[in-house]
Swiss-Prot record:
<keyword id="KW-0648">Protein biosynthesis</keyword>
<dbReference type="GO" id="GO:0005525">
    <property type="term" value="F:GTP binding"/>
</dbReference>
<feature type="binding site">
    <location>
        <begin position="136"/>
        <end position="139"/>
    </location>
    <ligand>
        <name>GTP</name>
    </ligand>
</feature>
<dbReference type="Pfam" id="PF00009">
    <property type="entry name" value="GTP_EFTU"/>
</dbReference>
<feature type="region of interest" description="G1">
    <location>
        <begin position="19"/>
        <end position="26"/>
    </location>
</feature>
<feature type="binding site">
    <location>
        <begin position="81"/>
        <end position="85"/>
    </location>
    <ligand>
        <name>GTP</name>
    </ligand>
</feature>
<keyword id="KW-0251">Elongation factor</keyword>
<feature type="region of interest" description="G5">
    <location>
        <begin position="174"/>
        <end position="176"/>
    </location>
</feature>
<dbReference type="InterPro" id="IPR031157">
    <property type="entry name" value="G_TR_CS"/>
</dbReference>
<dbReference type="InterPro" id="IPR041709">
    <property type="entry name" value="EF-Tu_GTP-bd"/>
</dbReference>
<dbReference type="InterPro" id="IPR005225">
    <property type="entry name" value="Small_GTP-bd"/>
</dbReference>
<feature type="region of interest" description="G3">
    <location>
        <begin position="81"/>
        <end position="84"/>
    </location>
</feature>
<dbReference type="InterPro" id="IPR000795">
    <property type="entry name" value="T_Tr_GTP-bd_dom"/>
</dbReference>
<dbReference type="InterPro" id="IPR004160">
    <property type="entry name" value="Transl_elong_EFTu/EF1A_C"/>
</dbReference>
<keyword id="KW-0479">Metal-binding</keyword>
<dbReference type="InterPro" id="IPR004161">
    <property type="entry name" value="EFTu-like_2"/>
</dbReference>
<feature type="region of interest" description="G2">
    <location>
        <begin position="60"/>
        <end position="64"/>
    </location>
</feature>
């Protein structure tokens, strides 16, 4: 069968499989490609091709991730699957693979296990907005009551972490049966049902250009007779010439008007998400704007110093610390384009944090940064990355 060409007309959604080790995440990923390949919506990838995921480096952290793509009648999907638990933790915290929704795989034979809980918590902390459940290996459970009990347990666990446990679609099946070509309701039918649930339940994400304008400032210079120019890559939204923007972070928020947008030395009417631009700012002196601040749509983002974070601490092998750190640890936190010193408060009962750990913590910065939930950052000591984190909650 001829391969369909990549359809740009379909909405694109990023998903991934999460769940406890050996509950069948990779088998399910392979099964999805096999079943959809029959309709020309995927290229079949065997378990081994997915499991031998190449290692990538994201901000100096080694993560093994398999990237698979497939399409349903409605959408095009990019799907990530990680071989090991540590890879999931790193992936979700660094945002290396942003997920618009996740497929939580739970073995019906075992029920929810420690990593099931941990992945749900991580999904909540790092801002994975939707979860669909695949209850796997149901052919190994003869007792229907037991099956209902496992489903109830999964729903309660999701609710415990503020996901709508009662509304979340749970599809029952056997990924292995589907992979072996079984056409029955636990095999192929279950995969189609799962994809229908993913299509319907996980909304198409908002495009970057539809979000409020934000541009991290990378450089500032003055052009004689014209004023101050801030350069950087537009992270989201659109800025039009003549629009008011706020300069947020590091000092008191200032308002200004963008009187010109330049790209590749040409003047434009607007700058869009993904563009590297120079924005000419009215009435601001060169020293009033600096790297580390952001230009943003007025009122869309505010400066903060205190926040809760979910953090992964690099191992020695990844070039991280060789020793643990303790309460009151004061490294630099690298947000977007600059480092800010901050102090760490560990959760009660946690004495120290070892390289390779992931941990929730509270941080207080010495100067405010334009901040919102889900913002990623690096933890550095003298320019060397020793950790990666994500803002789970802004405190003040």
């Amino acid at each position: 069968m001829a391969k369909e060409k990549f359809e740009r007309s379909k909405p694109h959604v990023n998903v991934g499989t999460i769940g406890h080790v050996d509950h069948g995440k990779t088998t399910l990923t392979a099964a999805i490609t096999k079943v959809l390949a029959q309709k020309g919506g995927a290229q079949f990838l065997a378990y081994d091709q997915i499991d031998k995921a190449p290692e990538e480096r994201e901000r100096g952290i080694t993560i093994a991730t398999a990237h698979v793509e497939y399409q349903t009648e409605k959408r095009h999907y990019a799907h990530v699957d990680c071989p090991g638990h540590a890879d999931y933790v790193k992936n979700m915290i660094t945002g290396a693979a942003q997920m618009d929704g996740a497929i939580l795989v739970v073995s019906a034979a075992d029920g929810p296990m420690p990593q099931t809980r941990e992945h749900i918590l991580l999904a909540r902390q790092v801002g994975v907005p939707y979860i669909v459940v695949f209850l796997n290996k149901v052919d190994m459970v003869d007792d229907k009551e037991l099956l209902d009990l496992v489903e109830l347990e999964v729903r309660e666990l999701l609710s415990e972490y503020d996901f709508p446990g009662n509304e979340i679609p749970i599809v029952k099946g056997s990924a292995l049966k589907a992979l072996e070509g079984d056409k029955g309701e636990l095999g192929e039918q279950a995969i189609f049902k799962l994809m229908e649930a993913v299509d319907a339940y996980i909304p198409t994400p908002q495009r970057a250009t539809d979000k409020p304008f934000l541009m991290p400032v990378e450089d500032v210079f003055s052009i004689s007779g014209r004023g101050t120019v801030a350069t950087g890559r537009v992270e989201r939204g659109i800025v039009k010439v003549g629009e008011e923007v706020e300069v947020v972070g590091l000092k008191a928020t200032a308002k200004t008007v963008v009187t010109g947008v330049e790209m590749f030395r040409k003047l434009l009417d607007e700058g869009r998400a993904g563009d590297n631009i120079g924005a000419l700012l009215r009435g601001l002196k060169r020293e009033e704007v600096e790297r580390g601040q952001v230009l943003a749509k007025p009122g869309s983002i505010t400066p903060h110093t205190k926040f809760k974070a979910e953090v992964y601490v690099l191992t020695k092998e990844e070039g991280g610390r060789h020793t643990p750190f303790f309460n009151g640890y004061r490294p630099q936190f690298y947000f977007r384009t600059t480092d800010v010193t901050g102090s760490v408060q560990l959760p009660q009962g946690v004495e120290m944090v070892m390289p390779g750990d992931n941990i929730g913590m509270e941080v207080e910065l010495i100067t405010p940064i334009a901040m919102e939930k889900e913002l990623r950052f690096a933890i550095r000591e003298g320019g060397r990355t020793v950790g990666a984190g994500v803002v789970a909650e802004v405190i003040q």
